[in-house]
Regions:
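Solvent-exposed coil/turn segments that connect beta secondary-structure elements
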Residues: 61, 79, 85-89, 97-101, ...
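Beta-strand cores of secreted/periplasmic/IMS beta-sandwich domains, seen most often
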Residues: 45, 69-95, 132-139
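N-terminal twin-arginine translocation
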Residues: 5-18
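Short aromatic-acidic-glycine turn motif
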Residues: 100-111
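N-terminal edge beta-strand
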Residues: 47-79
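Extracellular/periplasmic metallocenter environments
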Residues: 15-46, 118-167
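N-terminal export leaders
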Residues: 1-3
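Short beta-strand and strand-turn-strand segments in soluble, beta-rich domains
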Residues: 64, 111-119
Length: 167
């Protein structure tokens, strides 16, 4: 059908087939950019060095509504790889409005193919069994609240503290 349309615009049949084949190759891989935690975690961003790994679990298999750990300590200017997982049977959010304004998000990898988020990441939803890695640079010192805003999950609270680097 596309080749017929192209021939109506003056392309020969062989030119139309070649053009369609060339365009199809572009779209055979809908995810032309490959990203992996191995590549990003070791990549240097400006002077930040390799990512410092952190892990937070949202919820628990036992049904408890909690963040584990419930207190993260970061240093201003460092690149972090915050791995999150949700082993529970219900969805949970990692919501941190003020933290979103205090970090520079490099990338968020979630699933295959990875999803990339730009700008302020205020909410990250993890469905049951989901995992993701959030790469960011801690920028503004302070203590920031993290919560899961789902009704009934009020007990899920944590803090993230960004401190100035030691001189």
């Amino acid at each position: 059908m596309l080749t017929t349309s192209l021939t109506s615009f003056g392309f020969s049949s062989s030119e139309a087939l070649a053009l369609v084949s060339q365009e199809k190759k572009k779209y055979d891989n809908p995810w032309p950019y490959t990203a992996s935690t191995e590549k990003i975690g070791t990549k240097k961003f400006a002077t930040f060095g390799p990512a410092t790994p952190l892990t937070v679990t949202l919820g628990a298999k036992s049904g408890e509504f909690r963040f584990e750990p419930d207190n993260l300590k970061l240093t201003q200017g460092k690149l972090y790889a915050l791995a999150m997982d949700n082993p529970s049977d219900v969805p949970h959010y990692f919501t941190a409005l003020d933290l979103a304004r205090s970090v520079y998000t490099v990338v968020v990898l979630a699933g295959e193919p990875p999803a990339e988020f730009k700008g302020q990441v205020t909410d990250l939803e993890l469905k049951p069994g989901a995992q993701l890695v959030w790469y960011f640079v801690a920028m503004r010192p302070g203590t920031y609240d993290v919560r899961c805003p789902i009704k009934g999950h009020e007990a899920m609270a944590a803090t993230v503290t960004i401190s100035k680097p030691a001189l």
